[in-house]
Amino acid sequence: MTNIRKTHPLLKIINSSFVDLPAPSSLSSWWNFGSLLGVCLAVQILTGLFLAMHYTSDTATAFNSVAHICRDVNYGWTLRYLHANGASMFFICLYLHVGRGLYYGSYTYSETWNIGILLLFAVMATAFMGYVLPWGQMSFWGATVITNLLSAIPYIGTDLVQWIWGGFSVDKATLTRFFAFHFLLPFIVAALVMVHLLFLHETGSNNPTGIPSDPDMIPFHPYYTIKDILGFLIMLTALSALVLFSPDLLGDPDNYIPANPLNTPPHIKPEWYFLFAYAILRSIPNKLGGVLALVLSILILAVVPILHTSKQRSMMFRPLSQFLFWLLVAVLFTLTWIGGQPVEYPYVIIGQVASILYFMILLVLMPLVSIVENRLLKW
């Protein structure tokens, strides 16, 4: 008799995706982040659902409802901090996942890569709207500053901003719609994840060498299931440690002050995972130019497959490209640091240099160095 997992209409889909899926035998721990992101999404949806049962999306009560969750709801503080720090873990895994794709040339699977970029935008939008919900000072002013950037769009900008706000400033209507979209978007993300996996399973996984692995495949279960479970345990241990020992480490103390439209915080900045993009935005003196640079800082990932000039897929055997890759990582760390600093000398100039370097490495230096490496190999 054939096993039910191979005949049942639903189980056979799961079987072909997670059990009998042929996978390259050489996948390193860098391939764990896809499944870790799945766990992050599940944790965020579950904790978010329980938080939404107690949260009120009204300007008069939003801040107090979050305080009520932390003080009066059973394990409400755990839920709240799991959700807030879970977002940080989500972005750590996201950036490492994208970095892995860049390093090992996974972007040559263009459909999977492009859906991934769409997912990145969707998760960023979700995180931004979630940050507004506690209705603290940084929530309110962050929402005001970031939504106001849309006014830089010629002709329709001002109308667009007022349409998003639902009035002439960030107010009750804005908070209510942000809550609605913050609740809805993770389910759209979950649907996009399915499409992401669908396209991935059309081609099969890449591997660290970048060489086709068809002759050397192993079943996903038990080899990679057990490896993924180890990854889950490590990540959930790190998240638990963060939540239980220093839950406010990655947050902003200003967000414990209720939102006040009459009092601007001394330094408005987003959560740490957006600081690199915020630094790029601020490094251009022109408003529209800054907004374009902000969008392009993520959208630039879409042109990476087009600019792939190397005859090898992975950077594993390309030391010059490796140097540029790690330089890019250093530039991103620099931008993240600059995004959290005030707008004054010398931070402004450091941010501008780092922003130019960021775009230069991806658009100019990497394609050129790949051509040089091809020549060095006498291909």
Curated annotation (Swiss-Prot):
Residue numbers binding heme b b566: H97, H196
CC per GO annotation: mitochondrial inner membrane; respiratory chain complex III
Note: Heme 1 (or BL or b562) is low-potential and absorbs at about 562 nm, and heme 2 (or BH or b566) is high-potential and absorbs at about 566 nm.
Pfam families: Cytochrom_B_C, Cytochrome_B
Protein name according to UniProt: Cytochrome b
Binding positions (heme b b562): H83, H182
Binding locations of a ubiquinone: H201
Domain of life of the organism encoding this protein: Eukaryota
Gene3D superfamilies (UniProt xref): Cytochrome Bc1 Complex, Chain C
Biological process terms in GO annotation: mitochondrial electron transport, ubiquinol to cytochrome c
Keyword annotations of the record: Electron transport, Heme, Iron, Membrane, Metal-binding, Mitochondrion, Mitochondrion inner membrane, Respiratory chain, Transmembrane, Transmembrane helix, Transport, Ubiquinone
Family classification: Belongs to the cytochrome b family.
Primary role: Component of the ubiquinol-cytochrome c reductase complex (complex III or cytochrome b-c1 complex) that is part of the mitochondrial respiratory chain. The b-c1 complex mediates electron transfer from ubiquinol to cytochrome c. Contributes to the generation of a proton gradient across the mitochondrial membrane that is then used for ATP synthesis.
Gene: MT-CYB
Cofactor: heme b
